[in-house]
């Protein structure tokens, strides 16, 4: 089972974006985020919500960039 990591206040372009990642751990979610978006600082300062024990394959689930 993986966890869902819901990241808010990321991918900012005037307004905040959001990313959802399924991963075994926060460290694994960070690796997925940095590989896709090349922005470790964005991950490190994100607002997190974690939903534990979901039946979803590891990886990037969904994302939306902020915009204005």
Enumerate the predicted regions with their spans.
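A short, structured loop/turn motif at beta-sheet edges
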Residues: 1, 23-29
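Short aromatic-glycine-(Arg/Gly/Cys) micro-motifs in beta-strand/loop hairpins
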Residues: 1-16
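A broad, low-specificity signal marking well-ordered, structured residues that form hydrophobic/aromatic
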Residues: 5, 21, 62-63
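Intrinsically disordered, low-complexity segments enriched in glycine/proline and serine/threonine
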Residues: 11, 27-29, 55
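A short, exposed loop/beta-hairpin motif centered on an aromatic-Gly-Thr core
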Residues: 15-24
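Short, mixed-charge low-complexity intrinsically disordered segments
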Residues: 35-68
């Amino acid at each position: 089972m993986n966890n869902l990591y819901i990241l808010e206040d990321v991918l900012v372009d005037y307004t905040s974006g959001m990313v959802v990642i399924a991963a075994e751990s926060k460290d694994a979610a960070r690796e997925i985020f940095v590989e896709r978006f090349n922005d470790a600082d964005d991950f490190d300062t994100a607002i997190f919500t974690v939903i534990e024990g979901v039946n979803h394959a590891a990886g990037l689930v969904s994302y939306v960039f902020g915009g204005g």
